[in-house]
Amino acid sequence: MKRYVLDANALLDYFGDRPGKLRFAALLKEAAHSEQRLFLSVINWGEVVYSIWMKRGEATARQMRIAISKLPIEIVPVSAEDAFEAARLKAIHKLPYADSFAAALASRERATLVTSDPHFERLGKQIPVLWLR
């Protein structure tokens, strides 16, 4: 079974008609019709909502919240152990805070990280990445 962890910008690409949209749409379609699993840390979910709220306003952020809930994506809560691993990855690789949670979740789930964010190049080959660029 394929397992993917979504970085916030994967969803922002999708909802924002950015270059990664078509590749991410194909991933969503595959997840809806297969055993493939898509995970999103609640931290990265909050990052998506915040980004949309700041760019398009509260009403649009609330609509996106509903739209995301209808996608074949599992929103994953964060434990203290997850936060520790995210802090470790942030300290070692100098990742932005929210990005470190996506990386920690991908590591824990032995999943491929889905992103178009160049910050994740800092991980080297530690975590497999599906680039949406």
Give residue ranges: language-model regions:
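Active-site neighborhoods of divalent-metal-dependent phosphate/nucleic-acid chemistry enzymes
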Residues: 74-114
